[in-house]
């Protein structure tokens, strides 16, 4: 089909009734479907909170911080967008109320409004519009914008008003609004109730937005009669009322939406050029998801495990490592404090096939991570350390093998006599309180050179140089590198190109099958269809250990 318009189309995704309905996953799945139809798609998230970015927010409140190549600290939904579309987004993909108000106030102080009374309309909405419209580049067919929060929230009102204005300005034929709503199930009556969705759509229409499609989230199948009722009461075509019950895997969602006809309805309504969906890559992924040859357990040892979203990209990268090895990975959540003692580590890690030590901040939980690393090293359990995980491996090596029992990081003990981990020189002022903490870490994509013959270079398919995303203030203290190599046998297998910063450490394969760590956050570049090599290597080692144990038991 040939295009009838060269105008970039906008799809806005809103949510109603309750939060955490999966707006980001639904938007990402729709984006993946449109991309599979040959369209050029980009995505954006509008977040209503007043923080400039989530970089200084508590992970228990917000979940993980997703860092882009250009160093922006963004919402975890940006990670969903990158994984489902297999694209690299930049900081413009995440817009917050804090950013918008900061920019408007800065313009007012510079006198750019020429004495106008600065108001939400038009100044705030114009700034939001600018950030939406700049996504509509020449090489983009569709911009999908997720509006954070729930319809009815006071914080979301300026964003929803902006959506209404964008629809008015670019033309109704160029804008499509998808509203995601909850169908609660009332047990005693045995019914899915439509009234909350009707009220949610009514609230959206009060703002001036009529949804073009409604996605119904439920914990069970949605009867056709329910869809017809919502179509009638909410004035939406019956074919545009889409049921999206809970799926076995998040990677099933594109198939669910396609079966319900959402992508076909969107391209028809927006008059987009398209081809049939190419399922080649996605079908291979789903085969690996649902038909594994192995099943392994990987312990994730962290301090924020009460909120799994704090480690969302890590768990998805671990599972993708499983996809690379035709293995289903069960993630076992282990509170780091439970591994402080040898007995505690053995109790909580004795039944796992591999261990992952993710990043984090602050002293709490560090001794437990060190204990988990000691257990993995002594028992030859495959282990991957990320960011703080690398630093804990260095601390454990110094304490246990290099005869430096009081080795520590200046993050946890500023007066430590043996700072094997220390503050990066350019970060000293921020740590000492002379500058803002937000947005000042070593952030974004940085190169590293890998040692020949190392496990990490082998994992990266022999590449001498690689690039990964970073988010940290502390680094391995170079004054201890030689001592750790000689006494502990630790290999510094990757450094910055100038050799000043340690980026990768490992133990030789003769010492341990797979104990590897990086100062970076490789989980941020993992894709379900392109698993990251370090996570693929971890699961490969886990499968090998499991197979070897089974053979030993049979002998």
Swiss-Prot record:
Source species: Streptomyces griseus subsp. griseus (strain JCM 4626 / CBS 651.72 / NBRC 13350 / KCC S-0626 / ISP 5235)
- The protein's role, per its UniProt record: Catalyzes the ATP-dependent amination of UTP to CTP with either L-glutamine or ammonia as the source of nitrogen. Regulates intracellular CTP levels through interactions with the four ribonucleotide triphosphates.
Can you give the residue ranges of the Glutamine amidotransferase type-1 domain?
297-548
- Where in the sequence is the active site? 387, 521, 523
Q: In which pathway does it act?
A: Pyrimidine metabolism; CTP biosynthesis via de novo pathway; CTP from UDP: step 2/2
InterPro entries cross-referenced by the UniProt entry: Class_I_gatase-like, CTP_synthase, CTP_synthase_N, GATASE, GATase1_CTP_Synthase, P-loop_NTPase
Q: What is catalyzed by this enzyme?
A: UTP + L-glutamine + ATP + H2O = CTP + L-glutamate + ADP + phosphate + 2 H(+); L-glutamine + H2O = L-glutamate + NH4(+); UTP + NH4(+) + ATP = CTP + ADP + phosphate + 2 H(+)
Q: What is the activity regulation entry?
A: Allosterically activated by GTP, when glutamine is the substrate; GTP has no effect on the reaction when ammonia is the substrate. The allosteric effector GTP functions by stabilizing the protein conformation that binds the tetrahedral intermediate(s) formed during glutamine hydrolysis. Inhibited by the product CTP, via allosteric rather than competitive inhibition.
Record-given protein name? CTP synthase
């Amino acid at each position: 089909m040939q295009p009838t318009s060269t105008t970039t189309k906008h799809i806005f995704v809103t949510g109603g009734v309750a939060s955490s309905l999966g707006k980001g996953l639904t938007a990402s799945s729709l984006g993946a479907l449109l991309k599979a139809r040959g369209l050029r798609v980009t995505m954006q998230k509008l977040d209503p909170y007043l923080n400039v970015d989530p970089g200084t927010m508590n992970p228990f409140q917000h979940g993980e911080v997703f860092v882009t190549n250009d160093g922006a600290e963004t919402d975890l939904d940006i990670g969903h967008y990158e994984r489902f579309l297999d694209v690299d987004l930049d900081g413009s993909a995440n817009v917050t109320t804090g950013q918008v108000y900061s920019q408007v106030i800065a313009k007012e102080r510079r006198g750019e409004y020429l004495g106008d009374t600065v108001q939400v309309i038009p100044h705030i909405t114009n700034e939001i519009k600018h950030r939406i419209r700049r996504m509509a580049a020449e090489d983009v067919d569709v911009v999908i914008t997720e509006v954070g929060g729930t319809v009815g929230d006071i914080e979301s009102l300026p964003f929803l008003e902006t959506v209404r204005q964008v629809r008015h300005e670019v033309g109704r034929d160029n804008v499509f609004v998808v509203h995601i709503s909850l169908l609660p199930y009332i047990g005693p009556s045995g019914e899915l109730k439509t009234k909350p969705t009707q009220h949610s759509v009514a609230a959206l229409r009060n703002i001036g937005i009529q949804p073009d499609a409604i996605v119904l989230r439920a914990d069970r199948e949605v009867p056709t009669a329910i869809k017809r009722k919502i179509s009638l009461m909410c004035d939406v075509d019956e074919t545009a009322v889409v049921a999206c019950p809970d799926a076995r895997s998040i990677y099933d969602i594109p198939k669910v939406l396609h079966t319900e006809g959402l992508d076909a309805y969107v391209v028809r309504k927006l008059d987009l050029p398209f081809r049939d969906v190419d399922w080649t890559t996605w079908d291979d992924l789903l085969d690996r998801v649902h038909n594994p040859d192995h099943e392994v357990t990987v312990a994730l040892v962290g301090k924020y495990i009460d909120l799994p979203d704090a480690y969302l990209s890590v768990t998805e990268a671990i599972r993708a490592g499983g996809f690379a090895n035709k293995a289903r990975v069960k993630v076992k959540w282990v509170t780091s404090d439970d591994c402080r003692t040898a007995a505690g580590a053995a109790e909580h890690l004795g039944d796992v096939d591999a261990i992952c030590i993710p990043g984090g901040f602050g002293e709490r939980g560090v001794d437990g991570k060190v204990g988990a690393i000691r257990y993995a090293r002594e028992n030859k359990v495959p282990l991957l350390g990320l960011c703080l995980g690398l630093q804990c491996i260095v601390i454990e090596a110094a304490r246990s093998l290099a005869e430096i029992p009081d080795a520590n990081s200046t993050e946890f003990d500023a007066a430590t006599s043996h700072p094997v981990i220390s503050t990066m020189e350019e970060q000293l002022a921020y740590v000492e309180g002379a500058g803002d903490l937000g947005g000042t870490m070593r952030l974004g994509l940085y190169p590293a050179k890998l040692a020949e013959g190392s496990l990490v270079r082998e994992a990266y398919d022999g590449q001498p140089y690689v690039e990964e995303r970073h988010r940290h203030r502390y680094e391995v203290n170079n004054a201890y590198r030689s001592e750790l190599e000689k006494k502990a046998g630790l290999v510094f297998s990757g450094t910055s190109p100038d050799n000043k910063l340690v980026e990768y450490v490992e133990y030789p394969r003769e010492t341990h099958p797979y104990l590897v760590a990086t100062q970076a956050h490789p989980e941020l570049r993992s894709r379900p269809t392109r698993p990251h090599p370090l996570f693929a290597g971890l699961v490969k080692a886990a499968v090998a250990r499991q197979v070897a144990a089974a053979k030993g038991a049979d002998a």
